[in-house]
A protein has these predicted regions:
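Bacterial N-terminal signal peptides that target proteins for export
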Residues: 1-7
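N-terminal signal peptide c-region/cleavage motif recognized by signal peptidases
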Residues: 15-17
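Flexible, solvent-exposed loop/hinge segments and secondary-structure transition points
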Residues: 20-170
Length: 170
């Protein structure tokens, strides 16, 4: 009798398909990435600054890159690395750079080849979940780059606002 009950229970478990639990995630669209890039370019241009802006999706793939006329080629790679750093660490790169200067353990982050600890990279979140990152370079300094990235996020109502320290505003 015990054998029959155990067998029936086992057959019941095998017969019912296990339901896979899939996580619903938000993806950054090409349209959204282009709007962010355009907003960052406009914010910097309004201040007389020429930049390169790179937007990555949550997987670290480049979705959009825009470069103003005359911006040095090294800034294209710098903007990508700032975005990658913000995405990978889920941290504003200006804050990350300050932490690395203040903390010897965090200073080791500078030895990782893809990370760039300069201001201008911000993670992009929607409803509390990372959806990508933006990186700005060439705007005349880390604080200017960060301000243009922040202005782009502020112009995208579908993204969560970025709360940054106010004492470092250019």
């Amino acid at each position: 009798m015990k054998y029959m009950i155990a067998s029936a229970s086992l057959l019941g478990l095998l017969a019912s398909p296990a339901q896979a639990q899939l996580q619903a995630v938000s993806d950054l669209t090409l349209n959204a990435a282009q709007k962010l890039s355009t907003a960052a370019m406009a914010a910097c241009e309004a201040k007389g600054r020429q930049i390169v802006v790179t937007v990555l999706d949550r997987g670290g793939n480049i979705v959009s890159v825009q470069r103003a006329d005359g911006v040095g080629p090294h800034n294209t790679e710098a903007s990508r690395r700032k975005a990658y750093t913000a995405l990978s660490t889920r941290t504003d790169t200006q804050t990350l750079a300050a932490n690395a200067r203040a903390n010897p353990d965090a200073a080791n982050l500078t030895t990782l080849p893809e990370l760039l600890l300069l201001g201008g990279g911000l993670p992009l979140t929607a409803r509390g979940h990372i959806v990508g990152a933006i990186g700005v370079a060439g705007g005349g300094g880390a604080l200017h780059d960060r301000a243009c990235a922040q202005a782009a996020i502020a112009a995208a109502p579908e993204l969560d606002p970025v709360l940054l320290p106010t004492k470092e505003t250019p």
